[in-house]
């Protein structure tokens, strides 16, 4: 027996997995765009960083301080978010965690909407009608999320907590994959910037 009362060599209880969305990007969403303009907007969004001066929620900071592994998507907004919460500690950048694409429907140029509405319709058409415009499709994104879930579960298997700084929708896909693997969601803060979803093994 060990000092904790567990048999020597016993498998440790897996740590938790916390999926956090990045902070608010610097790119302004206060515009109305055509489909073509939204494509350009999304490309800029994908390479852009964070709006300066943000303060992450105390709960997320606490999760990061107590975690054994901190991982971020390779997108700049996720990397900068991880830098804010890491406070100097090292973290891993993982390309597997980037956001699923948002190609807009091919609607005429007289249709102008906010980026938020374009994002909604783009995701709807991508999810239900396989509108991917030659980019990653739903099945491919779900397979990538399943691979990410397996890697995160492997990291947590030793008993250390894992925190991920990534993206709103792809975090949802990872969460679905984790639940299929027996993980239970114990915290869900919605879809706002810096929000978290926390998973534990029963």
Regions found by a protein language model. Give the residues of each.
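Short aromatic-enriched loop/helix-cap "lid" or pocket-rim segments at secondary-structure transitions
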Residues: 28-34, 103-108, 177
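Signature for phosphate-centric chemistry
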Residues: 96-113, 118
